[in-house]
Amino acid sequence: MKNFMDENFLLQTETAQKLYHEHAAKMPIIDYHCHLIPQMVADDYQFKSLTEIWLGGDHYKWRAMRTNGVDERYCTGKDTTDWEKFEKWAETVPYTFRNPLYHWTHLELKTAFGINKVLNPKTAREIFDECNEKLAKPEYSARGMMRRYHVETVCTTDDPVDSLEYHIKTRESGFEIKMLPTWRPDKAMAVEVPADFRAYMEKLSAVSGVTISSFDDMVAALRKRHDFFAEQGCKLSDHGIEEFYAEDYTDAEINAIFNKVYGGTELTKEEILKFKSAMLIVFGEMDWEKGWTQQFHYGAIRNNNTKMFKLLGPDTGFDSIGEFTTAKAMAKFLDRLNTGKLAKTILYNLNPCANEVIATMLGNFQDGTIPGKIQFGSGWWFLDQKDGMEKQMNALSLLGLLSRFVGMLTDSRSFLSYPRHEYFRRTLCNLLGNDVENGEIPACEIERVNQMVEDICYNNAKKFFQF
């Protein structure tokens, strides 16, 4: 029987162990997509408790706690103490066997705090107190956590109207780790509620200095903000979309649709799809002009629980995997830009049924200008676990080039999520190590395998994003 989470955790063969310990483990972290709060980095925030850094905003844990019968007040309530919330989480942990939360929980305790005990109701108080004592130390601040995990670069997720003041403050402070913004213009496409769209246009107008009264004005304002993001080091965009939009439209139609929604009139479903289709092309061309990488996270159905959405708002654990037929629209969208204006692209699916769809889509638009110009993004959200990672890498291996993969990202709001890179690296090394041991990759090519591991963990992303 193997020990739980020892130095060879997830590494089933000697070759896998060597690949991880001698090659993957030493590589710095490039976290090219995350949801960290920039102000926390700028201010070098000192966390008040383990509950704050670990449970605050973590909808993965909240979902598990609710499923375990824990009352909502211990997840998101304001009338419960940090200890009471943590105690309920500790009661839930033993019920998470085979859920990635169990591995993440103990990997985070081990790597951040040096705690090798399992978390359960008996150990909860001891672990809570020990972690809180350490969190009070300067080396456990927001920046301290990033240093602890050998992070080199992080890319946050930012709205076009954001001032980026905390990115600027962080850079000017001399902090050695790069924190770069990512352009996330979802609200500029959100025309479902006219009043919300109009309010967003007013914010965009104010921050850009462009008076907005037409579609062209809106694009001009967005372009000014896009330029500003580039000045602050931005190299990626990100789009959270249900599905790909590639309806046919004319300029006259889009102008009329803008005027209609800007004037407060609800759009038809067809008009909404046409507008989103036009905006994806506008953003794609902007990104191509700058040499950025465009990312698309698609396939989620969000805010499914109306009662809880009204109570708590978005991103609180009431989203799930959607079922959309997107292959034709995805191909049509990429093809429209493939007239010399297709930027580097990463496609992330939330439904694993689309793994092979994406893996084969990549090859349609690789143009030989750079290795892996169109990427299959790492397992995302509900697929951000061992099985999901393996399936994504297997599909990419079978239908593309795993060796050109830009690797892992946390996609997280937590400063304790960096062990997900370790989890990914161990999974990667186990896949490749097993192939060598099974004679599916020749042992005489081990140096190439060593290099492949280092490339996927770090080098490919460094070159691809030009950090």
Task: Give a label for each model feature.
Residues K2-K290, T339-A343, L347-P352, E356-A359, ...:
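Metal-cofactor-binding active-site regions of metalloenzymes
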Residues E271, G317-S320:
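Metal/cofactor-centered catalytic core regions of large enzymes
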Residues A300, N305:
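Hard-cation-handling environments
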Residues F309-G317:
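Short glycine/proline- and charge-enriched loop/turn segments
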Residues E323-M330:
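Divalent-cation-assisted or electrostatically stabilized phosphate/pyrophosphate-binding catalytic cores
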Residues F333-T339:
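Short, basic/hydrophobic alpha-helical segments
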